Every structure is written in structure tokens, then in C-alpha cells.
Amino acid sequence: MSIRPLYDKVVVKRIEAQRTTASGIVIPDTASEKPEQGEVIATGNGRRLQDGTQVPLEVKVGDQVLFGKYAGQTVKLHGEELLVLREEDILGVVEASDAKLKKVA
């Protein structure tokens, strides 16, 4: 069983953040925040305009994307936590050369 999003919806699997700091301190689950980066695992067909034309989505399966902390709806499928959000809630696509982003304090 899999999930097929409708219209402009995108299914994202969160990419887990590093659990250890640069100095070697382990961050417990209770203190860590949910990651705001993930990989697109499924997309809908696109957004339908008022005149009936369909606009395809910009993101595709396999893209690494950034999204807001409170974006989308969390769902569980086969014990795995996934995020379903609208394409407009995606802030950007992480290009291959930028894949290792560092959080600025």
C-alpha cells in the first residue's frame, strides 16, 4: 500500500537531523526539533486553475526540499511518519552542491 497525493499535494519524508553536535554532545530526542528538510516521495498531478487548465508541479520525486516548521499534515503509513503538504508550502529545493546546509545561530 502506498499513498498517492491529489492535486498540488506533495508527500515528504523528513530527513533526520544530526543527533550529535560538533563537540560530540549527543542531543536527546526530547530536546531535538523536527527537521525542516525532507525528500519528496510522491507528488500529485498538479494544480487546476479556474479556467480548467492544469499546472504541473515544480517539484519531483527525489527532490530534497525545505519547508516551514509547522507546514503540512503529519500522517503515519506502515509505521513511518510522513508529511503531506501543498507545493506552495515548500520554501525551496536543495540543489546537490548545497545538500549539506548548516544552521546559522
Curated annotation (Swiss-Prot):
GO MF, any single term: unfolded protein binding
Protein name, entry field: Co-chaperonin GroES
Subcellular location(s) per record: Cytoplasm
Record family assignment: Belongs to the GroES chaperonin family.
Source organism of the structure: Methylovorus sp. (strain SS1 / DSM 11726)
The entry's keywords: Chaperone, Cytoplasm
Protein encoded by which gene: groES
Top-level taxonomy: Bacteria, Pseudomonadati, Pseudomonadota, Betaproteobacteria, Nitrosomonadales
Keyword Cytoplasm (UniProt): yes
Pfam families: Cpn10 (PF00166)
